[in-house]
Amino acid sequence: MARGLNKVMLIGHLGNDPERRETASGQSVVNFTLATSEGFKDSSGNLQERTEWHRIVAWGKLADICSQYLKKGRQVYIEGRLQTRSWDDNKTGDKKYATEIVCTDMQMLGAKDSGGGTSDASYSQNRPSYSRPSRPEPSSGNYGASPSSGGAQEFEKDDLPF
């Protein structure tokens, strides 16, 4: 049986501060809305803008980070999957449905003052964090020396192979 693909990638602005709760087992969960906008031309050729609102849910450590750093208006990149859940409405007895994006990766974008937090920070629910290895110090020799430090050599035009 062939596997399907359920992947969502969005860049938008938070419509509200994340609402943090805990499950009965103590696991963190946050919910927030994300607005994405796109431009299009109407039948008259006028430029219009359409905004789509998305329900986002994050769990565990990612939920804790979202509740701590994200604020209304903050621009973020969200990666996740679509999930539809259903429940019975206690008042009407009707079956209700909600489609939301289960967030597995989040990156804060934009300036610091656009909703708080640190710019360009990220967290992924699925992937381990890796840090860039430190750059080794140059060993003896003048590999990275600047011309002013005597590392460059003068060549005669006749010595060059081209």
Swiss-Prot record:
GO terms for cellular component: nucleoid. One of its GO terms (biological process) is DNA replication. SUPFAM superfamilies: Nucleic acid-binding proteins (SSF50249). NCBIfam families: ssb (TIGR00621). The gene is ssb1. Residues 5-110 form the SSB domain. Pfam families: SSB. The keyword DNA-binding applies. Residues 141-151 have a biased composition (Polar residues). Residues 110-162 are annotated as: Disordered. Transmembrane segments: none annotated. This is Single-stranded DNA-binding protein 1. Keywords: DNA-binding.
